[in-house]
Amino acid sequence: MKENKIRKNKEFRHVYRRGKSYSNKLLVLYVCKNRYNINRLGVSVSKKVGKSVVRNKVKRLIKESYRLNLDKDMKRGYDLVFIARNSSNDKDYKDIESALINLLKKAGIYN
């Protein structure tokens, strides 16, 4: 699973600069083609969202909803960076999951 994550600041900056962005009320998605046959995921949650407990909860919800929808007709070969907005701090799993799927469909990655 380590190779499926975007970890370095340089990799995040590359996706921000070269990628295309899509957004809704809860999340922002940056998408950029990569040279691998796998999708790599990065999650960013600002301190504006809340204290560390809240930020980590939002991160876990995003990662889990992505993991559970990974096998369902998703195109491969993209770097995906999800950024949580302030309004995501009090949402539950279903809200985050529907926002995530909505963004993936907007980007044309999820069928």
Curated annotation (Swiss-Prot):
It is an enzyme of class 3 (hydrolase). It comes from the Bacteria. This is Ribonuclease P protein component. GO terms for biological process: tRNA 5'-leader removal. Consists of a catalytic RNA component (M1 or rnpB) and a protein subunit. It holds the Pfam family Ribonuclease_P. Keywords: Endonuclease, Hydrolase, Nuclease, RNA-binding, tRNA processing. Its EC number is 3.1.26.5. InterPro entries: Ribosomal_Su5_D2-typ_SF (IPR020568), Ribsml_uS5_D2-typ_fold_subgr (IPR014721), RNase_P (IPR000100). Coiled coil: none annotated. GO terms for molecular function: 3'-tRNA processing endoribonuclease activity; ribonuclease P activity; tRNA binding. Belongs to the RnpA family. GO terms for cellular component: ribonuclease P complex. It catalyses: Endonucleolytic cleavage of RNA, removing 5'-extranucleotides from tRNA precursor. The keyword Iron does not apply. The lineage of its organism: Bacteria, Bacillati, Bacillota, Clostridia, Eubacteriales. RNaseP catalyzes the removal of the 5'-leader sequence from pre-tRNA to produce the mature 5'-terminus. It can also cleave other RNA substrates such as 4.5S RNA. The protein component plays an auxiliary but essential role in vivo by binding to the 5'-leader sequence and broadening the substrate specificity of the ribozyme.
